[in-house]
């Protein structure tokens, strides 16, 4: 239960960090780092149209923008707004490896996946600038914290280049 409780507490923080970090494309702060990694945000002009998020067989009807950022060998994908957004962090390979997914609150349960925790699973496919991320997210229902919640999910999203 300790691992599940840590995930339930860390899940919203991961989601908020990814969504807010990926949606700050309008800020222009100079970088004093000599890092060779590049950051290239890409916001979809049509919002989340064409983006599909399905959790436990139900379309989540996401709205808002899609923001993708490549940095340090990862692709950060944020869909929707900071409060209700969906976020994913993938490796920049092909096929990409899923590092984390934050699905937000679904029916009172904060759902997500983080690689290496032994909870849930996720895989991704890349086709050009489009990603399909599938797996099983986990969460804790505080009404019954000893029973973990597992929900299948699918995310189809296109990042503009």
Swiss-Prot record:
Cross-referenced Pfam families: Myco_19_kDa (PF05481)
Cross-referenced InterPro entries: LpqH
Cellular component GO terms held in the UniProt record: plasma membrane
Localization terms from the record: Cell membrane
PTM section of the record: Modified by Lgt on Cys-22 with an S-linked diacylglycerol with a mixture of C16, C18 and C19 fatty acids, signal peptide is removed by LspA, modifed by Lnt with an amide-linked mixture of C16 and C19 fatty acids.
Region annotation (Disordered) ranges: 21-49
Chief location: membrane
Keyword Cell membrane assigned: yes
Membrane topology: Lipid-anchor
Signal peptide: 1-21
Record's keyword terms, sorted: Cell membrane, Lipoprotein, Membrane, Palmitate, Signal, Transport, Virulence
Residues carrying lipid (N-palmitoyl cysteine): 22
Lipid attachment site numbers (S-diacylglycerol cysteine): 22
Family designation: Belongs to the mycobacterial 19 kDa antigen family.
Comment on protein domains: Forms a U-shaped beta-half-barrel with a large hydrophobic cavity.
Protein's job: Might be involved in ligand transport. A host TLR2 agonist, modifies host gene expression in response to pathogen.
Name listed for the protein in its UniProt record: Lipoprotein LpqH
Species of the source: Mycobacterium avium
Source species taxonomy: Bacteria, Bacillati, Actinomycetota, Actinomycetes, Mycobacteriales
